[in-house]
């Protein structure tokens, strides 16, 4: 009986080693709550009603060039935001970042400063974990299509996020804001970053023409917009709730202050709104709900690289680094504002 029990423990130990080894080889954390995999109807082969292969190829592109030379730099600039989102979400969910999950994608850039695992509830953890892993795919897709740039030095410390919120409110919050202390704090911090990616992709779309580049941007924009919508939706569910320990300051006020800060730093008018607005700014000027930030025709706002850098640097000046990029963002576009060579 004892030998049988020992044998069972030995087999269990071997299975554990194998599963852990497989996870390490892939580099990705494993979700232990996923059900046992079985054949899925989602991936079943689809045939035409005539019994042959269904025609699934898109029509031929009007522009016969996959990636045009002038497509490269705007798409590489986007990697600055993708790196930032990836590191923030991965560390928040798993306590590790690209250097542990996909080290080849960092292209030799320095690790982020101050990022750490957040104290998240189950639902928020699942959302953030998925977003983080999605960002890994985004970085890989951009690098595969237009080439990469090294990950810049990214400041994701509680101190930096505290400065962001102090800048948004115009005074020092007491205690300083820390995104890693709770699910709500992490969601509010997440409100700061992904929306800018949407603005950037909308602004980039008119200036690229290669069919592969256009396809890449559309795919990125779709998922980035969905991520922002989920984050805003989760915050909207709590819009009237006070954010502890800040007395009567509500979730809605936090989003309004952050959006106003981004407009102020961007210096190009209103391109950002919180989760509630005056009815005159709502969809068709008929509603004060603002789960999705959009213009008068309910279209996404566009921002230029210069606008984005003014906001991300927290300086209002694309020539003066700081904020999330203390040494400046990377790529030829960002470095040109600093009078430096391409990196």
Language-model regions, residue ranges each:
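All-alpha RGS (Regulator of G-protein Signaling) helical domain and cognate RGS-like helical scaffolds
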Residues: 22-343
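Cleavable N-terminal signal peptides of Sec/SRP-targeted secreted and luminal proteins
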Residues: 5-23, 45-48
